[in-house]
Amino acid sequence: MAKKVLVGMSGGVDSAACVLLLQKQGYAVSGVTLRLHHYKDRPGTCGSADDIEEAGRVAAQMGVSHRVLDLCDLFRREVMGHFVSEYCAGRTPNPCLDCNRELKFGAMLDWALDHGFDYVSTGHYARVGFDAASGRHLLLRGVDAHKDQSYVLYQMTQRQLAHLLLPVGEYSKPEIRALAADFGLENAQKPDSQDICFVPDGDYVRFLREFGGVTPEPGDFVDTSGRVLGRHRGLVAYTAGQRKGLGVSADRPLYVLSKDAKHNTVLLGDDAELFSSALLASRVSWIVTPPAEPLRVTAKTRYSQRESAATVTPLDGGAVRVDFDEPQRAITAGQAVVFYRGDVVAGGATIDKAL
């Protein structure tokens, strides 16, 4: 009997191609779309009514059943709520990480296993593997370096990886579009989504005010000597590396270096001051066997960043220190630092501060 796979369908070409690939491999495939929003004023965003309708049409075209799993309350609490609390604490979160952990490979996987499915699958550009020597399931980068999404999956557990199939990760984006076009899928040329789904216009301040009831509190811009340079509009309006929209007159370009929630200040400096050679991080997730000694890796602190050689040193309390061979620009509290050993994702953590 064919193994049963539940595919998370977003309405996009990658998840549709995922269905086609799994069908070719002989799996019994069903589709599911996660409802993330009750409202209809966010067309074209992940989990929207438009996505649900399109996913249903594409599923029917491929001859697979399709259902909708309502996770609106969980999404509001664990993703949108966490986004608000992190911003209010002076950090810059990546909500896609929370969505993958809590919804796609949390609630969706639990539902699938409870309803007789053997695996779940998504259209992520990453791969899964198994290391017989350690007995551990592995996460590997996708073969398309330009589309690789392993960075946002570093929190995967062994249980999740054991029930995960990622066929799209074996292909390039052009190959995936060609596969969908050959089948005649309506979404073969659908553009990739870019924005945070619940802040599609990029106005974080408005979202924090309307959803989180956050009223930004103005405070001081200061330099590294403590000198006040001007007034800011509230910590939530800024992130490390930002230059535009500061409203500060100076004889040189100024950038946001960091934010201090305790004192409600934003530290400004020149571009050279944005570079740091080390960081501290917590909430560590290891996919490989957790190391007891310093581990040589390549690492990156942003999704689109190139990796750099580094050493990860385990600390007391489950934290890590990461020392880079070359200084890194705009290391940002709240973002993820992800570690690689070749193509294998070793693990990752949430950045606490640059050193």
Predicted regions and their residues:
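ATP-dependent adenylation/nucleotidyltransferase module used to activate substrates
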Residues: 1-155, 165, 174-175, 181
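AMP-forming adenylation/ATP pyrophosphatase catalytic core
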Residues: 39, 121-355
